[in-house]
Regions:
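Hydrophobic residues within well-ordered, non-membrane alpha-helices that form the packing/core
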Residues: 33, 52, 56, 133, ...
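Non-transmembrane amphipathic alpha-helical segments
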Residues: 235-252, 270
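Charged, low-complexity interaction regions
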Residues: 253-257
Length: 309
């Protein structure tokens, strides 16, 4: 079946058509890349060819075929010389000198029909799709193991909704009543200052590690209606998991850049997820466990820390 659905991209929402197959999770890997792209400005595109090169996952003998050639190659089944080292190919019979040279270098060239070439191209596409999924969708897979919904939905839904589903499931499991929703009020947000305009050299960047989640955990900023402490326990677990991935990314940065980038990509969805608890907490008209005073305490504490930096 096919139905209209929505993809949550940081602060934006994009409509798309979701294909569903009973008993399966149908995932479009480009959605995972788009979600990472929304918070990582170094990712300039979401296409498979670009993103595979971006994560250094492209095979040296990767076969590329222009989309206009796929049909003719497969239907005509003409012969090609395939370079097994770099994936490039030449049509047999165009130049006799090329044919002679390729026939002698059996260690580099092999003769292959167009339909087999197309199959190799499609196999490479599938292999790269799996590699991209391993890089960008593991955070969603981790969340899907805990949240009472499908992996398919977790891969596209907003993070505030995930917290709501987690707490609803927790309450149902432990026989807890759902708190009454409250009304939303205005409060002072984060600290923002522009001290200089223009071009600067020797810029020093200072950053807090997971500022809002850390404030909640260190200062115990959680609503009283969470009588079992579920929000604190889950936030602590996900924050520690993200820090572990960040530390592993730093540890392997000089010795194994590929592994370092893999851990870096895995921590991105978790970063969004743990930071979104503040958003959920500050929206009591939507999130039943929200508390405006708790949200205001988090931003107030954050401003104080920034002034002391």
């Amino acid at each position: 079946t096919r139905k209209d659905s929505m993809l949550k991209l940081a602060n934006e929402v994009e409509n798309f058509t979701q294909t569903s197959i009973w008993g399966y999770n149908v995932i479009d890997i480009i959605h995972a890349v788009r979600r990472a792209q929304a918070i990582n400005s170094s990712i300039k595109a979401a296409g498979l060819k670009y993103i595979t090169k971006f994560i250094n996952a492209e095979s040296p003998n990767r076969v590329y075929i222009d989309h206009t050639d796929i049909g003719p190659f497969y239907a005509k089944k003409e012969d090609f010389w395939l370079n097994i080292q770099n994936g490039k190919y030449k049509k047999v019979g165009i130049d006799s000198k090329i044919d002679e040279a390729c026939s002698k270098r059996t260690d580099v060239y092999t003769k292959i029909t167009g339909d087999k070439l197309v199959e190799m191209y499609l196999d490479d596409d599938l292999d790269e799709t799996l590699k991209v999924d391993q890089e960008f969708n593991q955070g969603s897979f981790l969340l899907a193991a805990m949240i009472p919904t499908t992996y398919e939905r977790v891969s596209t839904m907003g993070t505030a909704t995930l917290w709501k589903m987690l707490m609803l499931a927790w309450s149902y499991k432990h026989g807890l009543a759902i708190p009454a929703k409250e009304s939303k009020t205005d409060f002072v947000g984060g600290l923002s200052r522009l001290l200089k305009v223009g071009y600067s050299k020797n810029v020093l960047k200072l950053d807090f590690s997971s500022l809002y989640p850390s404030i909640q955990l260190v200062h115990d900023v959680f609503p009283d209606c969470d009588v079992t402490g579920a929000m604190k326990g889950m936030l602590s677990y996900f924050r520690n998991t993200r820090i572990k991935y960040k530390q592993l990314a730093e540890e392997f940065y000089t010795t194994d850049r590929k592994k370092s980038e893999s851990y870096g990509n895995k921590q991105l969805p978790i970063k969004i997820f743990i930071n979104s608890m503040f958003g959920a907490l500050s929206a009591p008209q939507v999130y039943a466990w929200g508390d405006m005073y708790m949200g205001e305490q988090i931003t107030c504490t954050g401003r104080q820390y920034l002034r002391q930096m």
